[in-house]
A protein has these predicted regions:
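Acidic, proline/glycine-rich low-complexity IDRs
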Residues: 1, 109, 113-152
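Low-complexity, serine/threonine/proline-enriched polar segments
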Residues: 24-118
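Short, extreme N-terminal segment that most often corresponds to the first beta-strand
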Residues: 1-38, 142-152
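Compositionally biased, low-structure terminal segments
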Residues: 8, 60, 69, 73, ...
Length: 152
């Protein structure tokens, strides 16, 4: 199983990986972009992902934290300076490849996580489609505060 998780916030924030609520059967989800922060409503839940009280993704297996802790922290530091505007620019591919080369982690939102036909799309289009009813975020700057690519 392979998955991407991209954490997005309206402000820079510290985020800890919480692996306490994972279930081995939660394997149907292949990609999600997740807003964190109480000020942003989450309109839907995705199978296989639990959202904690602070809005962060809760992983399923405890071994993910120990195995990816250093990679997660390195990626978080790298992504914390990148803005929403940078990720929806024409440089998205170059940014992704640079991160992949340095950290071995992809930053790719994947459409329709419950569908078998996955394809990469820009962060901009993912957010616009997922949050198209939330006009108040149209001019908001978002920060990538963490990104994880993992296998099990």
């Amino acid at each position: 199983m392979h998955n991407y998780i991209l954490f997005i916030s309206t402000e820079k924030t510290d985020l800890k990986i919480n692996t306490s609520c994972m279930c081995p059967n939660d394997i149907g989800m292949h990609g999600i972009a997740d807003y964190i922060g109480n000020e942003i409503p989450i309109p839907m839940s995705v199978a296989g992902v639990k959202v904690s009280e602070n809005g962060s993704v809760v992983f399923v297996r405890s071994d993910i934290e120990s195995y990816f802790k250093k990679r997660f922290n390195d990626m978080k530091e790298k992504c914390s300076v990148l803005t929403f505007k940078q990720f929806c620019s024409t440089d998205l591919y170059d940014i992704r490849k640079a991160i992949e080369v340095h950290y071995g982690i992809y930053v790719v939102p994947v459409t329709d996580p419950l569908n078998e036909n996955y394809y990469a799309e820009t962060l901009d289009s993912f957010l616009r489609e997922t949050y198209k009813y939330f006009d108040e975020y149209e001019q908001q700057t978002f920060y990538i505060v963490a990104a994880v690519d993992y296998h099990w």
